[in-house]
Structures are given as structure tokens and as C-alpha cells.
């Protein structure tokens, strides 16, 4: 994938979500929620501060993160693959 995000933007690939409940029931429709875990594919250089310096990013390519899936999350198709473009501030945690 040939994409380079700007500023504090992060490109994510959403992880697949489990489609069966713990009891073995297949979940469909609204019961099968989207995962809020994703793999980081690309990271911008950081947020530009008022004094002209750049605040470095905390996430790096390859990290698995948990993110806030709501306003500000942009979905795009790049090279036939659906990716998410978000600000680093919408990332809630890095999974270790």
C-alpha cells in the first residue's frame, strides 16, 4: 500500500470481528458489531504545534490499537482494501 498520512493522521486496517457468540450462535446484522481493534499501516510525522515544532507520534507501523469508532473516522478504499484514516487522538490504547 502506497500511502503517506500527513500531520497526526494514522492509517488503520480494522481487525476481523468474531461472528459467533460464546454459545456458538452466528451473529448477523446489528448483533455483529464492528471491531474497534486495528493494525496500524502508516503513521504521519506528528502534530504541528503553534511554535513550529512537531509533537511526535506515540503509535508506530505494526502496532495493534483500540480506537474510538465515531465522528472523525474516515473510511477509504485504497488498492482495493478498506482502511480507516483517523487522528492519533482517536486512538485509546496500544495492545501489547
Curated annotation (Swiss-Prot):
One GO cellular component term: cytoplasm
Domain of life, per lineage: Bacteria
Cellular location(s): Cytoplasm
Example GO BP: chaperone cofactor-dependent protein refolding
Coiled-coil intervals, chain numbering: none
First-listed, main subcellular location of the protein, grouped into a coarse class: cytoplasm
Keywords: Chaperone, Cytoplasm
Keyword Methyltransferase on entry: no
Xref: HAMAP family: CH10 (MF_00580)
Subunit architecture: Heptamer of 7 subunits arranged in a ring. Interacts with the chaperonin GroEL.
Family of this protein: Belongs to the GroES chaperonin family.
Function: Together with the chaperonin GroEL, plays an essential role in assisting protein folding. The GroEL-GroES system forms a nano-cage that allows encapsulation of the non-native substrate proteins and provides a physical environment optimized to promote and accelerate protein folding. GroES binds to the apical surface of the GroEL ring, thereby capping the opening of the GroEL channel.
Protein name: Co-chaperonin GroES
Amino acid at each position: 500500500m502506497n500511502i503517506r498520512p500527513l500531520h497526526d493522521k494514522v492509517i488503520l486496517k480494522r481487525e476481523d470481528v468474531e461472528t459467533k457468540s460464546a454459545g456458538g450462535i452466528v451473529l448477523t446484522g446489528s448483533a455483529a458489531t464492528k471491531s474497534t481493534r486495528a493494525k496500524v499501516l502508516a503513521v504521519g510525522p506528528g502534530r504541528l504545534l503553534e511554535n513550529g515544532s512537531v509533537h511526535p507520534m506515540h503509535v508506530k507501523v505494526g502496532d495493534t490499537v483500540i480506537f474510538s469508532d465515531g465522528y472523525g473516522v474516515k473510511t477509504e478504499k485504497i488498492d482495493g482494501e478498506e482502511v480507516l484514516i483517523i487522528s492519533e487522538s482517536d486512538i485509546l490504547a496500544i495492545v501489547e
